[in-house]
């Protein structure tokens, strides 16, 4: 709170841990939950649409996911199960009216294609690291674009160029805690409080004030998850 973070979304990565995430949201008014199974999660319960919809009925659950595609560790040709899992999450999102948290790693074309084929209605491209062409395709589908602490890294100049182009009303920020700690704390454990430093960098990139960027991203968060 000292860094003006007033609310945040605690993301579910498998159904076995949903109760822990949900209980945090029940106990703390500033914390909200999602429900979903991460694309790289294995040795876990496979979600079906009906089960996701049951969990999504809680008013503390504001999103479906984390879902999406990840071909970094899994060959594309071996990932049919991952694509099918993604489609089920999109169905649950569309039916529940709760937006998706979309993970995309080394799977740009398939992620955009499936979002389009399934007529995804709302969501955010979480921890975005791709190029402008991919961002534009996601924006054209109605997605929001969220930037993490990666935006502050010295190696992230191409990503900062993308961040300049995103329409202000589609920008979101995150930490992807406990990973990807932003500068100047890189190498240390991450914290939701460090969202401030992502906002700070985004304001610098877009030549605006920190207060203005915080107001914009807060408004966008409320628009996506609470409208």
Located regions from the model:
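Mid-domain alpha/beta scaffold segments of enzyme catalytic cores
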Residues: 1-227
